[in-house]
Structures are given as structure tokens and as C-alpha cells.
């Protein structure tokens, strides 16, 4: 059985056959993706799964990664933050270094393809070196509130593309090129989302030091203020007055000083309360994340600022009720009182946690509905169809 056929048991009926028909039109074409890294993030996971499938279907698919020095990465991170709306000071020297380093990347990488998709901001200026083919900028974040100066600088490069693709309507900035919407997706058969036996889940949690003797509230997210882990702790404390629960906060700090400071504070909280577990996991800890989400009674994603927030879809696919912040793509995934709850405050988060703890049948039904909603809208099979349709459109 071919890899694409493995998805027939999880995808909506007819989806795989639709992909096969679209792939016939794209056979022999060369499809290139360029990212700033191979680890972490929904884009990387999608590409790891989609590339081999498309190649199997006769669409030559490659994945290149840009690199650089510390100054390059520092500027790239600051530029990304500014494009997401954060206040950042970007020096002309730093931006020039970013452009120059991508110029070096363009000379090192094989950029020859019929369609080249460049993901997010770090490698975006590669387009200046384009030599034939169609080029697409794939944005995975909300740039609708980008800082004016950085956006004006960045737009000079994005407008050189043939099209831009955004995860949701409303996430786009002002551009002079065609724009499309393709929501991201999860791979239901990956190590991060594939089935685990109850024994496997128990063994992984035991190795992580997470006891299962009481209901688990779980948030998996980078240790960043945008994901409000301190707000989650405060919501847990309110719930703890009424229910004996355990809170697990798992994620990465990525070596960022501000995130490391936040992680240090959370570790202090965990030392004072044995029912708060803080786990710093490497980006490749997919199996551990899978087990934590499956063991959760309730999954929380209390972001105050968010891109699409694929952690929500991951938890939904695992049949879990999710309480999320009213931010970014979380609101597109959580249908209020059907697949989960969106909240704006610590008190609201605590109230909805108590609602679900007090009504296990409601929590179970919400989890079932969440899984079906994810099946219809957020699996990689839908994403493959979208990309193949985009490929056909660009090559007409």
C-alpha cells in the first residue's frame, strides 16, 4: 500500500482520490519549499509529511533550508516580531546583513523549480535571486498589524513574488500581488499525532515524571508571554480551590533570554506547588507531546497573541476539549460550546475548566466533535489538495 493510501482510514471519504486526480495534472513538475529550519513549527511538520507523498505521486518535491550567522538570526527574529506587531528597533546594518546573508544562501541553494514556496520571513528576500519559475511567499503568521516601517521594508521583497498565501482571512498585510488562503494542517499519522496505546502513554508520562492520579490540565506551547503561561497558572489556582487537579506546562524556550527568564519563573512556581509540572522539551519531542495531549483531561491554549495555533488542532484530533485564548487562528478552530471554548481572561478560563470538570459527558462530547471538525478541516490531506490546486493555478 502506498503512503497516500495510508490516509484513507483517517481522511474524509473521497479526499485521497481527489488528491490523486490533482496530482496527475502536476506530474513531472518541480516543487521547491524553502524554510529557515527543519525543526519545530507546523510548517516543518507538514513539509516532512507532504514532501514524500508528493514525490510518490510524481511531483518532484524538494526542501531547502537557509542558514546564517548570529547577526543574521538576531535580525531575522526581530524582523519577524515586528511583522507580527511587536515594537522592535531594526538597524539598517542588521537589515543589510539579513539581505546579504540571504544573497549568499541563494548562491548555495538549488533554487531551480517550476514553483518555489518560501516560508515566513527569514528566507523571504531570496526572491531577489529568482531566475525563472513561479514564486510564492507562504506566511504562517498574522501580519495584519505589522509595524509600519518594517512592513514597508519587507514588502519590497514580498511584492516580487507571484502570489502570497496566508493561513486565514484577515492575516494578510497590504500587498500588490494575488493573495490566497490555505489554512495549515497536521499530519494525523506522524509521531506527534499518530495513535499511542494506553500503555505507551503511561510509560512516556512516567518517564517525564507526570503522575496521572488526578485530572490533568495541559498546555503545550513555547514559554513565551504571548502564550500566557502565567495566566494559565492563575486559572489553575482558581480551579484548585474546587477541584484537585494537576497542571502541566510543556514547551521550549529556544534560548531566547526573555523566554528563559519566564521559564525560570515558572520553574520556581513548580517548586512551590507539586501539582504544577513544568517541562522544557526539545523541538523534536513529538512523542512526548503526543502522550501529554492524549493524557490530558482538558487542553489549554491560552494565547493572547497567536499565529494559527496548530497545537489546538493537534489536541482536537486526539479527541480533547480545548480552552483557548481569543487570538489568531484559535478562534477559527474552536467553535464555541461545540469543539471548545475561547476565553479572554483568567477568570473565564478557570470557569470553563470547572464547567468541563463538572460535566464529564459534555467534555467527552466536545472532544468527539472536535476530532471530527479537525478531520474535515485540519488534516494534511486537505492541505495537499490545496497545494496541488495552487500549483495547477500558478502553472496555467
What are these regions (language model features)?
Residues 304:
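Aromatic "clamp/platform" in nucleotide-sugar-dependent glycosyltransferases that forms part
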Residues 355, 362-377, 383-389:
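A short, well-ordered alpha-helix in the C-terminal region of glycosyltransferases
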Residues 290, 313-317, 331-332, 338:
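Short alpha-helical segment that forms part of, or immediately flanks, the ligand-binding pocket
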Residues 312, 321-324, 334, 342:
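Short hydrophobic beta-strand element within catalytic cores of glycosyltransferases
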Residues 259-291:
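Nucleotide-activated donor-binding/catalytic signature segment of Leloir-type glycosyltransferases, i.e.
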Residues 205-227, 233, 247-248:
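Conserved donor-binding/catalytic core segment of Leloir-type glycosyltransferases
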Residues 1-30, 48-113, 173, 182-189:
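A conserved catalytic-core segment of Leloir-type glycosyltransferases
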Residues 336-347, 355-360:
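Conserved acidic donor-binding segment of nucleotide-sugar-dependent glycosyltransferases
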Amino acid at each position: 500500500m502506498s503512503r497516500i493510501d495510508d490516509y484513507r482510514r483517517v481522511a474524509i471519504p473521497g479526499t485521497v482520490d481527489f488528491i490523486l486526480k490533482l496530482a496527475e495534472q502536476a506530474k513531472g513538475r518541480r516543487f521547491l519549499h524553502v524554510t529557515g529550519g527543519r525543526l519545530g513549527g507546523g510548517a516543518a511538520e507538514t513539509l516532512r509529511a507532504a514532501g514524500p507523498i508528493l514525490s510518490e505521486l510524481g511531483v518532484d518535491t524538494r526542501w531547502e533550508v537557509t542558514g546564517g550567522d548570529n547577526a543574521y538570526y538576531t535580525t531575522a527574529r526581530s524582523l519577524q516580531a515586528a511583522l507580527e506587531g511587536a515594537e522592535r528597533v531594526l538597524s539598517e546594518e542588521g537589515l543589510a546583513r539579513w539581505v546579504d546573508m540571504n544573497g549568499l544562501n541563494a548562491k548555495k541553494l538549488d533554487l531551480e523549480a517550476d514553483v518555489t514556496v518560501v516560508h515566513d520571513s527569514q528566507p523571504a528576500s531570496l526572491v531577489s535571486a529568482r531566475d525563472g519559475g513561479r514564486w510564492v511567499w507562504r506566511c504562517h503568521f498574522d501580519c495584519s498589524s505589522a509595524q509600519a516601517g518594517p512592513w514597508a521594508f519587507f514588502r519590497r521583497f514580498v511584492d516580487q513574488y507571484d502570489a502570497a498565501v496566508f493561513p486565514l482571512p484577515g492575516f494578510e498585510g497590504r500587498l500588490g500581488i494575488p493573495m490566497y488562503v490555505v489554512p495549515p494542517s497536521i499530519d494525523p499519522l506522524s509521531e506527534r499525532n499518530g495513535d499511542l496505546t494506553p500503555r505507551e502513554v503511561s510509560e512516556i508520562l512516567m518517564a517525564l515524571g507526570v503522575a496521572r492520579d488526578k485530572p490533568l490540565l495541559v498546555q503545550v506551547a513555547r514559554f513565551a508571554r504571548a502564550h500566557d503561561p502565567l495566566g494559565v497558572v492563575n486559572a489553575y489556582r482558581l480551579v484548585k480551590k474546587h477541584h484537585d487537579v494537576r497542571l502541566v506546562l510543556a514547551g521550549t524556550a529556544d534560548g531566547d533570554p526573555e523566554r528563559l527568564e519566564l521559564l525560570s519563573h515558572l520553574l520556581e512556581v513548580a517548586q512551590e506547588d507539586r501539582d504544577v509540572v513544568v517541562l522544557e522539551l526539545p523541538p523534536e519531542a513529538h512523542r512526548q507531546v503526543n502522550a501529554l495531549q492524549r493524557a490530558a483531561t482538558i487542553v489549554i491554549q491560552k494565547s493572547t497573541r497567536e499565529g494559527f495555533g496548530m497545537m489546538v488542532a493537534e489536541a482536537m484530533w486526539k479527541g480533547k476539549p480545548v480552552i483557548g485564548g481569543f487570538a489568531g487562528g484559535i478562534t477559527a478552530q474552536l467553535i464555541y460550546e461545540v469543539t471548545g471554548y475561547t476565553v479572554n481572561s483568567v477568570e473565564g478560563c478557570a470557569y470553563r475548566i470547572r464547567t468541563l470538570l463538572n460535566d464529564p459527558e459534555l467534555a467527552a462530547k466536545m472532544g468527539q466533535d472536535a476530532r471530527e471538525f479537525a478531520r474535515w478541516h485540519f488534516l494534511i490531506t486537505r492541505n495537499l489538495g490545496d497545494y496541488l490546486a495552487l500549483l495547477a493555478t500558478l502553472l496555467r
